[in-house]
Amino acid sequence: MKKYRDHYFLKAKQENYPARSVYKLKEIDNRFKIFRQGMKVLDLGAAPGSWSLGAAEKVGPRGRVLACDLQETDTVFPDNVTFMQENVFERSEAFENLLDEIAPFDVVISDMAPRTTGTRFTDQARSLELCLEALAVADRCLIKGGSFVVKIFMGPDVQELVQAMRQRFSAVKSFKPKSSRAESKETFYVCLGYRGVETSDTDK
């Protein structure tokens, strides 16, 4: 096991996080200041729960985190986190109702990743699909001026996502945290200042 992996793996265990990925979110927030006390956060692809725990710390007891994932998790969350086992591609009526109850969200974060096949092109295409679905959820429930953070496996089609995000946000920044593994193809896009979906005259 590589030294940097040892460091973040052990650090997560020592600080009672279920996964090392929380340090990626912490780096993102340190750089871009996306969280504030009292905010409402939607966490897509939340299991095993490290990002939700990290976000919950940042928004505090007056804030709220709605976490969802296809997989169940046995992580014990604080009172300001609600976890729901859910497929964001097939959002149930119960999930839609919960979105309506809590929305609008100040921040939508997505650490979703596909089951990898070992075929880079396939994995990248599936990652893009997840990112676009996360963006569609953000369109559904993100407040104007809000922020969106999404992970993608880099590939030739990433510009499709970047263009879609630039149509919606005042600023779109790419960022690879130091806590990401060096060989990983993942990159995070941090989008600030949500404007909404711009509609052309022909679409009106």
Swiss-Prot record:
Keyword set includes Methyltransferase: yes
Catalytic reaction(s) noted: uridine(2552) in 23S rRNA + S-adenosyl-L-methionine = 2'-O-methyluridine(2552) in 23S rRNA + S-adenosyl-L-homocysteine + H(+)
Gene Ontology molecular function, alphabetical: rRNA (uridine-2'-O-)-methyltransferase activity
Domain of life: Bacteria
Binding site for S-adenosyl-L-methionine: 49, 51, 69, 87, 111
Keywords assigned: Cytoplasm, Methyltransferase, rRNA processing, S-adenosyl-L-methionine, Transferase
Keyword flag Secreted: no
Localization terms from the record: Cytoplasm
EC number(s) recorded for this UniProt protein: 2.1.1.166
Active site per UniProt: 151
Main localization, broad class: cytoplasm
Any matching Pfam family: FtsJ
A single cellular component GO annotation: cytoplasm
Annotated family: Belongs to the class I-like SAM-binding methyltransferase superfamily. RNA methyltransferase RlmE family.
Known function: Specifically methylates the uridine in position 2552 of 23S rRNA at the 2'-O position of the ribose in the fully assembled 50S ribosomal subunit.
Listed HAMAP family: RNA_methyltr_E
Protein name, entry field: Ribosomal RNA large subunit methyltransferase E
Species assigned in the record: Nitratidesulfovibrio vulgaris (strain ATCC 29579 / DSM 644 / CCUG 34227 / NCIMB 8303 / VKM B-1760 / Hildenborough) (Desulfovibrio vulgaris)
